[in-house]
Amino acid sequence: MAEAEDIQPLVCDNGTGMVKAGFAGDDAPRAVFPSIVGRPRHTGVMVGMGQKDAYVGDEAQSKRGILTLKYPIEHGIVSNWDDMEKIWHHTFYNELRVAPEEHPVLLTEAPLNPKANREKMTQIMFETFNTPAMYVAIQAVLSLYASGRTTGIVLDSGDGVSHTVPIYEGYALPHAILRLDLAGRDLTDGLMKILTERGYTFTTSAEREIVRDMKEKLAYIALDYEQELETAKTSSAVEKTYELPDGQVITIGAERFRCPEVTVQPSMIGMESPGIHETTFNSIMKCDVDIRKDLYGNIVLSGGSTMFPGIADRMSKEITALAPSSMKIKVVAPPERKYSVWIGGSILASLSTFQQMWIAKAEYDESGPSIVHRKCF
């Protein structure tokens, strides 16, 4: 097995909030860490600490008190390439402990990623990291593969952006992809705001992490929002407690379902866009009438912001109300959907039929970064 391990492809899913990285063929990523780069706010405070000029991931998170944190990926798209390079370097050398020049690398990208961005990713892999081969795959397509399908519509909602991506026979249909700039980070912000109204203060990036954890542990999506609000007013059934790091205990009730309801009703935070259910429906309606039935019957949820209990039932209910009455609607919420993009990449990169799909270093040297548009689609 040691032989095979040497040339095992690496799979790196770069999300706005978290990086998921590991080896093709594994059933889960080996490394999951925050997509952040932190730089010291004040130089030379800690004498003799051998201070680095930048920290990445968990280390940046734990030293956040003395750092300025930056997220190089905004709304799913890389916006700061120097920091992105630091994240990849950290992924290969510190997290996976591999030499990137010895492994093919499969990277993921957001739907509708600008062409220049795909080229830049390709260039950095070959020129900075000297990878022998690489490939760029669309995140939602990998999630669909992970669910064992090649046709369906994926609602992929992470920390920084949500997309609805209709896929037919393995190919995303670009004209029908819709983007919703409402995702996990906005929900965390919303919960911070609700808690602030109640007299708690959460302002720093450290405190935001606490609220994110609270959201992940306690929030859920109600099947009937209005009815749930009524229930919450009269009974304590929805109340749960959460202990803060300092030992203080917070009780949250209606906030548990008010927070993620925003995904269905963005108007709650003053956004004029349609919710996740309507965006999914609109995406389907942009597709050819002949394939809609296949899409309605294969609505696949993916990404950390689809992890809320109750989301599949609510999506099913809302889309059923929008779709033709005779239409069979099926919403699939795979239990591993938090990592299904990565898992799909792991599956794809280990297929024998995929091996001719890689962009090889020689092809890159001959054609330059634009090779990515010819080989990855």
UniProtKB/Swiss-Prot annotation:
This is Actin-3. Coiled coil: none annotated. Actins are highly conserved proteins that are involved in various types of cell motility and are ubiquitously expressed in all eukaryotic cells. It catalyses: ATP + H2O = ADP + phosphate + H(+). PANTHER family: ACTIN (PTHR11937). It comes from Pisum sativum. Keywords: ATP-binding, Cytoplasm, Cytoskeleton, Hydrolase, Nucleotide-binding. It is found in: Cytoplasm, Cytoskeleton. Its EC number is 3.6.4.-. GO terms for cellular component: cytoplasm; cytoskeleton. It holds the Pfam family Actin.
